[in-house]
């Protein structure tokens, strides 16, 4: 049986945490709820695994929040394939129509919700700079490899191709030659639960598709999730070994208006 939601999940006193957040996809309500639950501090390393934009309703709001986090925590923002598509479409390196069909229309609309047509000129230059200059291809610590999509098991992160880092599905993951665990997103887990293998964990839990946005306290092995409705739940890595169900997880619902 999973235990009740913790008031401040996985935050022992005086311990720097490494936190990893899966694909956000424009779901700013879920991100705000998750940040309120996890409370990343200045000493915490917060790795966001990419795909901040597209599909969900508020990519602009998500990017505003991420830029704000740069001043309040040690943010390590990774680039995802949807950021690559966004930048390529803005710079006309690809036909924008292809990007618009995979969630780009929602992104542009978030910058100009009252416009009857897509207003490309409303996209924030600050957001473009953040994505193109400050988002990185990968992050690595002593025990873990953080990538958006996947990594070729036989190459260092510095030698990975774009195809592996941004486009290869989690199904094709294998133990890395470094012996480190890989933590990634990209491949939506429509069950709503992280996909855990002995050598890798996928944290994309389909928040834009009525799933959850997941944050993992990497060292403690604790997961906290939030959704667009404002609900929160948490569980441990050990509990995932015995697959949980919606009936065995304590879910904290948002307070009713006026309560």
Regions found by a protein language model. Give the residues of each.
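Residue-level marker for buried hydrophobic side chains located in beta-strands
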Residues: 20, 46-48, 77-78, 145, ...
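Divalent metal-coordination and catalytic microenvironments
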Residues: 23, 51, 66, 80-81, ...
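His/acidic metal-ligating clusters that form di-metal
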Residues: 120-192
